[in-house]
Amino acid sequence: FTSSAFWSPQGLEATAPVFGDGPQLPSPLGQAFATINNFKRLPVADRLSIAGLLVAMLDLNRSPAVYERYDALDALTLFRQLRISERMINEFLRPILLVGLFKPPEELSAAVTMELLYYYALAHQDSFDVRWIKSKSIGEQLLAPLSRRLCDAHQLQVLGGTFASRLNVSPTGATDSLETRSLATGETGVIDDVDAVVLAVGARGMGSLMARSAECAALAPELARAGGLGAIDVVSVRLWLDRSIAVDDPANVFSRFAALKGAGATFFMLDQLQAGNEQALWGDQPVQGSVIASDFYNASAIAEQSDQEIVDALMQQLLPQVQPAFRHAQVVDQEVRRYPGSVSLFSPGSFQQRPPLETSLASVVCAGDWVRMGEREHGAKGLCQERAYVCGLEAANSLLRRGVVRG
C-alpha cells in the first residue's frame, strides 16, 4: 500500500495516508484522525464545512424517488446548497472528482458523486487504500492467465483488436449473428449461431453498435437511449528517463495547473512502486532511470495536442512542481495513447438512461460500471472496477438462470 499526494500551482496541498495503518475507529472518525495533519493549506473551518454532505449521504438511498432526485442534480449545486465552502470545493472536492469520476462537479450527478465519496472514503476506513502490483501489469499478471485458462479448458476464442460492428436479431428478438471488424486490417467477419450476447461496452461503443443494428435498436430502445449518453476522453503517457529521481509519494494527483487545460491528472513512479523489478519496466533495454505513468482525465483539450507537447507539459510544467530534479532529466523513450470516449460519464439525470442488466431481448444482457442492476444492485452505482467485474458475473448468471444458455 502507498500514500499519495495532491499538488497544485501553490505546491503540496495534502497527502492521503495509508488509512489501514491508522487506529481503526468508527467512520468518519478514523478518516478524520488519520488526515488531521495532512492538509497543508486548507483551513479547518473549510474542512468542517463538508459536514452537511454526510447528512445528504444518509438521505440518498431512502427511496428510489429520492435517489433520482439527487441524480437529477449536479454535484456543484448540491455542494453549494449544503453551504460547503468554495475553497473546500475548489481545492479538495473538484480535484478529487476530476481523478475519481473524471469530470468537474458541475458535470456530475450528485447521487453518483456522493456514492463515490461514501464507498471509497467513508464506508470503511481503509477503502481508499491502493495496493500496487509488484511487477508488470494487471493485464499481464491476471487477465492474460485467465484468458489462457478459459481458452485451454473451455475452448474460448479471444478476438483481440476486433470490434463488434453489427448485432443481427430476428423479428422475434432472437440473436442470429454478430458481425465483426478487425481494427488492424479492416477485415470483416461473422459469428453465426449466437446463443447470447453480453454487451460489455461503454456509451460510445453502444451508440456505434446500435447505429448499425437497426432491428436490435428497435426491439431494445433502452440500448439506443444508452448509446446517446456522454463519455470521457482519457490520455495515458509513459516516460522512461535517463536518471532515477526520488519522489516522496509514488502516487500523485495534479490539480488547477494551466497546463492541464481543465483535465485532472495523476502520475505514478513505477520504478518506486515496482522496486526490484525495474528490468520488466525497461523490457529488453538496459535499465537507466525512473519510469513514470501519467493519466489525464476529462482530457479532450489535452488529446488535441501533439505527443511532444503533452510530454513537454509533463517534464517542464507539471513534474518539476513536485521535484525540481525533473527539469534536468532527459526522456529516452515515451509513449502517448489517446482513448476517446473510453470512460463512463455519470452526468446529472443519466441514471434512468443507463442500460439495464437484462434488456428487452432475452438473449442480450449488459455488463459494466454504468449498468443498472435492478434487484441485484449493490454498492456504488457509478465508476468502479469492482462493480464492473461483479456486473459481468451477474450478466452471465442471468443468462444461466433464465435458461438462455447452459453451463
Residue ranges of predicted features:
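Mid-domain catalytic core of redox enzymes
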Residues: 133-134, 162-292, 297-303, 312-313, ...
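FAD-binding beta-loop-beta segment adjacent to the flavin cofactor pocket
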Residues: 279-285, 340-378
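Active-site/ligand-binding neighborhood in enzyme catalytic cores
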Residues: 49-177, 181-184, 193
